[in-house]
């Protein structure tokens, strides 16, 4: 297995992590409080036992395992497992991966992941979600989204958008995020 960079999402709609819960209003990587001692605990107390448990139960798995954690005191605690990457965490993790993602995926599929090294950009990444007015409750759909073509030196990830009449429009509560 390989461990990708840590990431933390921000779920609440309001400033200062207030208001209603959402699917994620943004994320950062690396996680400021996840120092080497803490990430070592994660690997030894959670990641290794998870991988070993899958092997012991004869459950072959090839792919991503996203482990959602909280920090209780100085201890990591699992709150969820997903067999996909998280959103919006992916949008701050993948841009930090300097290794060729296709090569990583091929190595996973071939069972040769142990033969590659992951090169990680040491710089931090932040993503902020743009959402429809009213989200996460009743929100507008169909309005045109403009201005993303003017964003420089950042990545724009679309989600909840569609192209209609040659224009990018809102089709869901979360529309895009910039990293």
Where are these regions (language model features)?
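Internal nucleotide-binding/catalytic subdomain
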Residues: 1-90
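Short, well-ordered beta-strand elements within core beta-sheets of diverse protein domains
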Residues: 27-30, 127-129, 175-179
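Internal helix-turn-beta structural module
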Residues: 152-179
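Hydrophobic side chains in beta-strands
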Residues: 71, 129-131, 158
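Active-site "cap" helix and flanking loop/linker of ATP-utilizing ligase/carboxylase catalytic domains
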Residues: 43-65, 82-151, 164-166
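Short clusters of hydrophobic/aromatic residues that line enzyme substrate/ligand-binding pockets
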Residues: 25-28, 145-148, 156
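Active-site/binding-pocket entry motifs
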Residues: 9-12, 134, 162-163
């Amino acid at each position: 297995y390989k461990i990708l960079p840590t990431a933390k999402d921000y779920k609440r709609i309001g400033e200062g992590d207030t208001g209603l819960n959402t699917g994620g209003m943004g994320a950062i990587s690396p996680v400021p409080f996840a120092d080497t001692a803490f990430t070592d605990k994660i690997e030894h107390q959670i990641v290794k036992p998870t991988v070993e448990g899958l092997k012991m139960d004869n459950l072959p798995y090839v792919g991503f395992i996203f482990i959602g954690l909280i920090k209780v005191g100085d201890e990591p605690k699992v709150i969820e497992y997903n067999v996909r990457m998280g959103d919006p965490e992916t949008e701050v993790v993948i841009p930090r991966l300097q290794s060729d993602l296709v090569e990583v995926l091929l190595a996973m599929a071939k069972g040769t992941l142990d033969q590659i090294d992951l090169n990680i950009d040491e710089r931090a990444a932040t993503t902020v979600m743009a959402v429809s007015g009213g989200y996460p409750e009743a929100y507008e759909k169909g309005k045109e989204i403009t201005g993303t073509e003017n964003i420089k030196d950042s990545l724009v990830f679309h989600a909840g958008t569609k192209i209609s009449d040659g224009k990018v429009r809102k089709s869901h509560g979360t529309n895009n995020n910039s990293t």
